[in-house]
């Protein structure tokens, strides 16, 4: 198995001479709410049945996100494009953006939770990825499989990364693989984030966070503790915490 992985890596690394080093990725992020609810053991049976009845067996919500990247860093945020599901929704989008500076090894993030805005500033941490012996095509790129566990949200996350785009970036709060993350599968399909288009793009100001951001500044440890406490509160109430925080 190890020899197979080595051969695959050698083949993919040979493509780096012509690798894309700069551009924009368009992702489709699909949340399957009924399946997501089934991953939450603390929801009462009545609550699960009620939500399944209301939403149907295949209730899903699509949204689009963008990742700007180059060798220096990346920036992940909402897209202005609306999905079919959100056509009738005219409310404002929450502030959301994740900037990673690979040269300075820093993370800057803005997000909203329970009506409040938070700004996360910290160093980039090493993520505990396990690279597996599987490959598949995503948006025309041969990708390798990796896995990681989110111990706070109780998630098994599968990532597919393209070694022919040797940028250690990705969607959501995930990065740190030897290639751009093209797809995420969270908890066996409760949420799928999939790259649908990659465009060459000269990066200028696209990776800058909005100016004059206002919010409470916290570090990564405080962020994780806040998410952990919020989930614990919702567990006690037998409610789904992911109506308010990203799954």
What do these predicted regions represent?
Residues 1-25, 244-247:
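Bacterial Sec-dependent N-terminal signal peptides
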Residues 20-247:
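Extended soluble regions of mature proteins
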């Amino acid at each position: 198995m190890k020899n197979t992985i080595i051969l695959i890596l050698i083949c993919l690394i040979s493509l780096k001479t012509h690798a894309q080093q700069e551009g924009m990725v368009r992702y489709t992020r699909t949340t399957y709410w009924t399946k997501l609810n089934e991953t939450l053991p603390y929801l009462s049976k009545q609550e699960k049945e009620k939500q399944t009845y209301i939403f149907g067996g295949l209730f899903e919500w699509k949204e689009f996100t963008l990742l700007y990247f180059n060798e220096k860093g990346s920036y992940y945020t909402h897209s202005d494009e609306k999905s079919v599901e959100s056509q009738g929704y005219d409310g404002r989008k929450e502030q959301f953006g994740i900037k990673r500076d690979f040269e300075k090894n820093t993370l800057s993030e803005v997000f909203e939770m329970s009506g409040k805005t938070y700004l996360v500033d910290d160093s980039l941490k090493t993520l505990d990825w396990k690279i597996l012996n599987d490959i598949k095509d995503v948006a025309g790129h041969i990708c390798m499989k990796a896995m990681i566990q989110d111990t706070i949200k109780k998630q098994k996350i599968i990532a597919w990364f393209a070694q022919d785009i040797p940028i250690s970036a990705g969607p959501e709060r995930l990065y740190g693989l030897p290639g751009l993350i093209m797809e995420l599968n969270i908890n066996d399909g409760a949420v799928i984030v999939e790259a649908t288009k990659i465009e060459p793009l000269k990066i200028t100001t696209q990776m800058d966070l909005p100016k004059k951001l206002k919010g409470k500044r916290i570090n990564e440890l405080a962020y994780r503790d806040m998410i952990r406490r919020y989930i614990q509160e919702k567990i006690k109430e037998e409610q789904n915490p992911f109506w308010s925080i990203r799954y």
